[in-house]
Regions:
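Catalytic phosphate/metal-binding cores of nucleic-acid and nucleotide-processing enzymes, i.e., regions
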Residues: 1-99
Length: 99
């Protein structure tokens, strides 16, 4: 089933909030292509998330921005469904536990 970017982003915000964190919206008129959200979680954990409608991919400009952020040592995730939000949060929880 196709989910809108708005639905995926809302699920991400709620999942991050449940873990005591915030998913800050990034609005940059000076650097196009940055991910939609900067996620900050307890324990000094920070990563970027690009949300998309189901089946949609990052544009070339976005991919270049993601690579720039990764080259600086940040994790960048592109998710296009609420199921992938759940998968990402499970991965983050496992990393927090050192597994």
């Amino acid at each position: 089933m196709k989910e809108s970017e708005k639905v995926v982003e809302a699920k991400l915000r709620e999942a991050v909030k449940q873990r005591g964190g915030v998913a800050l919206k990034i609005l940059s008129q000076y650097h196009a292509g940055l991910p939609d959200r900067l996620v900050l979680l307890p324990g000094s954990r920070a990563f970027f998330v690009e949300t998309k409608s189901t089946g949609c991919k990052a544009r070339l400009l976005q991919k270049k921005a993601h690579e720039m952020l990764r080259s600086l040592g940040f994790s960048v995730y592109v998710i296009d469904s609420t199921e992938k939000v759940s998968d990402l949060m499970q991965l983050i929880d496992l990393e927090r536990l050192g597994l």
